[in-house]
Structures are given as C-alpha cells and as structure tokens.
Design a protein with these regions (language model features):
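Short, compositionally biased leader-like segments
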Residues: 1-8
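Short aromatic-glycine-(Arg/Gly/Cys) micro-motifs in beta-strand/loop hairpins
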Residues: 12-32
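A short, charged, amphipathic alpha-helix used as a generic interaction element across diverse proteins
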Residues: 42-57
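C-terminal structural segments of small proteins and small subunits
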Residues: 55-71
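Anionic, Ser/Thr-rich low-complexity intrinsically disordered regions
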Residues: 8-10, 16-18, 59, 71-76
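Residues immediately flanking
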Residues: 32, 43, 64
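A short, exposed loop/beta-hairpin motif centered on an aromatic-Gly-Thr core
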Residues: 35-40
Length: 76
C-alpha cells in the first residue's frame, strides 16, 4: 500500500501545478499504474468513477492544492 501511495504521489506531483487554477480544493484520485486520474468534488464521486474505469485497482487520493485530504478535529 505504501508503494501505491508513493507511485500515485509521483504522478500527482507532475500534474499538480497544471490543475491548481481550475481545480484547487477538489479531490483527485490517481491510479498509479496507468497514471489515469479522476477529479471530483468528494471522495465518493472519484471512488465510483475510479472503480468503473479501473475495477480492482487501488488509488491515491489527494486534495488539489493542499497537503491533506481531511483534517481531523476533536470537538468533544
């Protein structure tokens, strides 16, 4: 799994700057073997499309223009 993340991150790093102006804040799912990627408004949207395009494959998920997909908070 870490190898999948590293390969997906390498693909994402190559295309991130070209996506920033139009897609900042959106979610991107990167399939590391093919280099294919899906951009959407949330994880569910990109997961459904990713499963349709590449059944059985794993993806790296990133939020375009940020270093994290989610920020966990403790409100209690």
């Amino acid at each position: 799994p870490l190898g999948i993340y590293k390969r997906a991150k390498a693909v994402y790093s190559k295309i991130e700057k070209s996506l920033l102006s139009e897609h900042k804040g959106k979610i991107i799912a990167v399939e590391p073997i093919s280099g294919d990627y899906i951009i959407g408004s949330d994880e569910v949207e990109v997961a459904i499309e990713g499963k349709r395009r590449h059944p059985g494959r794993k993806f790296g998920l990133f939020r375009i223009g940020t270093s994290v997909v989610h920020k966990l908070r403790r409100d209690w």
